[in-house]
Amino acid sequence: MAKHGAGKLLPLEGLRGIAAVVVMLGHMVRGLVPPGPGPLAPLNTLHERVLNGGASVTLFFVLSGFILTLPFGKDQRPARVVVAMLKRWPRLVFLTVVVCVISWALIWQSGDIYARAALVNHNWWMATHFNAPLAGADVSLVGALTDGLFGVFGPGDVHFDSPLWTMRVELLGSLVVFVAAPLLFLVRRWWVRLVVVAVAIMAVGTNPPVMYVADFLVGAVLGMLQAEGGLPVFSNRAAVLAVGAGLYFYCFSAGPVPVIYAPLKLLLPTANVAHYAWEASSALLMVALLGNPALNGVFGQEWGVRLGAWSFPLYLLHVPLMLSVGGAVLLLATPHVGVSVAVPLAAGMTLGLAFLLAPLLTEMDKIWTLGLGKIIRVPKSGN
């Protein structure tokens, strides 16, 4: 079977970007929309049924495992493993520090505006600084630098930006891939590879953050298939079926679910195992986009590439902006137009600023990454 060219990977950027937007929209609902009945109550239902942040984060992890595995298809030397490990923390830390400093500046400027906004929308997530309480935390510039450099990667400190909880998972999962991928490529029999991966997934268990390593291993398997030309080509009908199944698994919730999910809920009853369904979703969506020319063409267009490039900054920026700027808009607008109108205004301002800043952070990160690549490089074979 012919191998998929590097250009055929571009649709995954579009998929990553859409997943980031889903997370952002879900967080807008979770942090701004009042709980209980009311004009905006359908948004809470939409969040529960469609805007699945857990499935989106799983997709991020599976995509990371996929992309990080590909270079080892041609080079399994220990030198590549060492360089990959040395580069991973510096590669991630630049934007985490930048966003923690931005969040610190927003907190310094806006104070407890998020708490006052919570008195308007009666929203627990807003009241608790999006489940990252500031009480007792070091919210100084030094604290922001410490969190961005080390806290989010080690103990999982997320006082400044709660979505940064994914960073220690990203670092851990990446290191596992750097060790596992070259070893798995050396094993030529696929059934042995799959048995090893299945045992590893069972071994990591169902307790966070270690359980998310399974997502990276699923991505590694897909990456090995890609590197060895083993991903299938999908007809349009097969692609529709794969995407439909992928979306079915994507919308599966760790909480109450519609009757259509009853059989799946029996198999995956708790939050700690729900991500297995989301792994299946990620795999189905990825292979459909890579294997179907029509989907490949749609998601590989400029909009998808740009959105994918902005996805990480968007993911990191939106919550600090919502808690400060969004909270201020909610407070200022509610007396004049009511909560039902103020909430969309706050969400719109938050999302608009996130999309305005994301390209700048993307370019800054690109410069950082290029510089890092010049400093830490894989030695040529034979040197």
Where are each of the predicted segments found?
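Transmembrane alpha-helical segments and their boundary/interface "anchor" motifs
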Residues: G54-V57, F72-A135, R306-L317, M322, ...
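C-terminal "closing" transmembrane helix and its immediate cytosolic amphipathic cap
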Residues: A2-K3, L106, G229-G230, F234, ...
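Alpha-helical transmembrane segments and terminal signal-anchor/GPI-anchor hydrophobic tails
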Residues: M211-R306
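Structural signal for the C-terminal ends of transmembrane alpha-helices
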Residues: T69-R77, A105-S110, A180-R189, A220-G230, ...
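Functionally critical transmembrane alpha-helices in membrane proteins and complexes, commonly lining
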Residues: L10-G73, V93-T96, P209, L285-V287, ...
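Short, Lys/Arg-rich, polar N-terminal cytosolic tail immediately upstream
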Residues: M1-P11
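Solvent-exposed interhelical
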Residues: L171-A200, L225-N236, T334-G338
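Membrane-interface helix-loop-helix regions
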Residues: T45, R49, V97-L171, A283
